[in-house]
């Protein structure tokens, strides 16, 4: 199976997000890469579900709380930017202060 670099990136994000979901379900606090992957995957799936850019930007701040991530992680992530494919094309989503 041949995958484009973009498809490989999507699979890597999905895999990291899946690991983060499992760790979160066990009550573990997420580290920086797990936090970014989980939020990024949620944004990508939201676009697939038909949500708008504005909806995703708003929802992106409610995916994880400060109590679900390791100390210092919220301060490390001032924003997350993701290029997401919508039915009408690819758009850049920016979520400011994603972990509140």
UniProtKB/Swiss-Prot annotation:
Annotated Gene Ontology cellular component terms: cytoplasm
The protein's annotated pathway: Nitrogen metabolism; urea degradation; CO(2) and NH(3) from urea (urease route): step 1/1
Principal location listed in the UniProt entry: cytoplasm
Its GO biological process annotations read: urea catabolic process
* Localization: Cytoplasm
The EC class name is hydrolase
What are the EC numbers? 3.5.1.5
Q: Spell out the Gene3D superfamilies in the cross-references.
A: Urease, gamma-like subunit
Reactions performed catalytically: urea + 2 H2O + H(+) = hydrogencarbonate + 2 NH4(+)
Keyword line: Cytoplasm, Hydrolase
GO terms (molecular function) for this protein are:
nickel cation binding; urease activity
Q: Which InterPro entries does the annotation name? A: Urease_gamma (IPR012010), Urease_gamma/gamma-beta_su (IPR002026), Urease_gamma_sf (IPR036463), Urease_subunit (IPR050069)
Question: So what family is this one in?
Answer: Belongs to the urease gamma subunit family.
Q: Quaternary state and partners of this protein?
A: Heterotrimer of UreA (gamma), UreB (beta) and UreC (alpha) subunits. Three heterotrimers associate to form the active enzyme.
Q: Which NCBIfam families match?
A: PRK13241.1, urease_gam
Write down the PANTHER family for this protein, in alphabetical order: UREASE
UniProt-recorded name of the protein: Urease subunit gamma
User: Whose protein is this, by species?
Assistant: Bordetella bronchiseptica (strain ATCC BAA-588 / NCTC 13252 / RB50) (Alcaligenes bronchisepticus)
